[in-house]
Amino acid sequence: MSLDHTQLPVGIFFMQAQEQVVFGRPAAQAVLEQVERMGARRVFLTSGRTLGQLDDGPLQRIRRALGDRHCGTWSQIRAHSPREDVIDGALAAREAGADLLVAVGGGSVIDATKAMLMAIWMKLDTPADMAPYRNNQPQGEARPVEAPVDAIRMLAVSTTLSASEFTPNAGVTESQTHTKQSYSHRLMVPVTAILDPQATLDTPPDLLFNTAIRAVDHAVESFCSPRANPATEPLSLQGWRLLARSLPAIQADPTDLDARLKAQFGMWQAIAGSVAGARTGASHGIGYALGATFDIAHGHTSCVMLPAVLRWNAAVNADRQRLLSEAVGQPDVPAADLVAALVARLGLPGSLRDVGVGPEHFADIAKRALVYVNLRDNPRPITRIDEVIEILELAV
């Protein structure tokens, strides 16, 4: 028996400040129960413009259920959560005297609402005020996000499969430079995430499926992560398995609420390993650069980049990738091919050409991508522009 710790895996499993996940119940009922549990009296709703314009969508049903507890709605959040939308929403919530925020929407809405919490806590009034609090600041320039003792919190009702409701991080876009900025605080994670498959029925299929491939990206990259461990691996693998099976079922029958709930469970499992410490890699890092620069949906960046990254990484982790193939009963099919086939089956873009990106953009994308730590956390670490370009060429 060896008593030498140097032979043991070393890591930290991060627990989130999330109290509950409510699943399989009507969102309006679940929100009202959570509001009553928390003793909130002035509830402020956030969403994107499309949901805000529905006559009887999840936002409208929640608003009716809240009755006189509803103190306002901000339905102007755009894709990629621009800083301007964060500040405008925070000012509106502050003016309304909100004591609880409820985000109803996809990743951009939930991320923006998390950043709104920070803006309310720190009394930020302009987009520029946010800059000192972003992650990965140069040494000496960063300011910590501080939540007051009675910090306003949020609930999240997801209408997509982005999984933003399970993380304490907010991805926000700086419009002038087209760069994605990350903000985080442990209390920015929603107190409760509500998974109601019915709330996804009004989501266009392309949006639902492209966020689903983003969830696949979470599962696959966290499973392949050098920081994966026996606690995170089952989460990532089950997330991939559930998504690979449920998404074709949803495509075959869009009204199948059981398949939609299984996809929500898959999305939840997929992100769980990542936020616990098994970090994502180059597909995410390059995807951040693509999304912010060319206004490409995060899910579409995963559709395009994940197969290419898997192929590039296979030189160092082919055995690991085979476990992904075995998990869905196809051990002899490369994981990259399985992901690409799922993307194609769902009618999503499968190449950079499909999203309007050509070789003339590669050098700029590579330069922007290198700032993201995900590239250094990749199973095959990336530190040079030419390495990013190699991957981009696999995605043409």
Model-derived regions: residue spans:
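ATP/NTP phosphate-donor binding region
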Residues: 1-100, 352, 386
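Buried hydrophobic positions in well-ordered alpha/beta secondary-structure cores of metabolic enzymes
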Residues: 24, 45, 82, 107, ...
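Short glycine/serine/threonine-rich phosphate/pyrophosphate-binding segments
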Residues: 28-32, 54-56, 83-86, 108-113, ...
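Short Gly/Thr/Asp-enriched flexible loops that form oxyanion-binding sites at enzyme active sites
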Residues: 60-61, 89-90, 109-123, 167-168
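Glycine/serine-rich anion-binding loops at beta->alpha junctions
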Residues: 98-116, 159-164, 293-296
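A glycine/threonine-rich phosphate-anchoring loop and its flanking beta-alpha core
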Residues: 122-230, 320-323
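Active-site segments that bind and position negatively charged phosphate/pyrophosphate groups
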Residues: 222-338
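C-terminal charged capping/lid subdomain of soluble metabolic enzymes
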Residues: 325-396
